[in-house]
Amino acid sequence: MDTSTILVATDLSARSADIVQKALPLAHKLNAKLHVVHIIEEKIFTYLDDADTLLEKAQNALEKLFPHIPKEQLHCQKGKISSSVAALANNLDAKLVILGSSGENGGLKSLFVGSSTKDIVRSLTMPALVVKTTNDLHVDKLLIPTDFSEASRWHIHAMRSLFPEAKITLLHTFVVPFSSRLSLYGVKKGDVNLLEENLYTNAKNKAALFMQNLNDDSNQVDIIVREGGLDAGVFTGIANMHGIQTISLHTTGSISLFAFDLLLETDKDVIINIV
């Protein structure tokens, strides 16, 4: 079996060090080498004369934090954090980049001084797993929103390739156009209900065709169709009902804006795949 690479970005905090420790069993499960990177924001060097000493001390801090990881898999660099993480991930041909989120109560603030998780995610060409929970990493169950697009199909296959043993639950939502206004316009409740039933039937038919065209193991992928918008609270609630810790999204079509909103609001771990 070929060995792949997982890259974890760390700011040397206790929280991010804990994420590295949690990434180790995931890397083992996926037969992947775990690399760790710390980027020193380049602007820091404008205030210091001895850049080499700072880099050396940061490298030593990495090695002290993670003595069980081979030194050649620990990287300390200077530069713009988002582009530097992305460049190293590309050079390593990483299949997954793992990031931590900071801030109280699941709020997403700066991951590093001068850079944000969103900036890093947008710079990547591979999936990013943003860790928001304090639990061990669990990717055996994934919740994925789908709009039945080709990009969505590609994303699902990408997740199946990355996590071949994962049980995937797809979620498709539909909305009744102008539902809050229809009664004001004199539309009877029975007619509104009939419209909703027709839209639901249409969505279920599209879901069945989409599942058929996935050419995947039906025991590993199922789908939920429900009325409503892509709301982070509802989405997180569905994840809770199904015992799912990790939500996975791609960033095109109707999912695009929702991806980063969900990243802000949910208390679940989130995989974002730039398509």
Regions found by a protein language model. Give the residues of each.
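Well-ordered alpha-helical segments embedded in enzymatic catalytic cores
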Residues: 19-22, 84, 155, 233-234, ...
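Gly/Ser-rich helix-loop-strand patches that form or flank binding pockets
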Residues: 86-136, 238-275
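A short acidic, glycine-rich active-site loop
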Residues: 54-60, 190-202
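Short, solvent-exposed loop/turn segments at secondary-structure boundaries
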Residues: 46-50, 109-112
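Structural beta-alpha unit
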Residues: 1, 53, 66-99, 212-247, ...
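General small-molecule cofactor/ligand-binding pocket signal
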Residues: 35-37, 73-77, 129, 169-171, ...
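GTPase G-domain guanine-specificity segment
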Residues: 181-184, 202, 207
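Small/aliphatic-rich secondary-structure junction motif
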Residues: 1-49, 141-192, 215-216, 265-266, ...
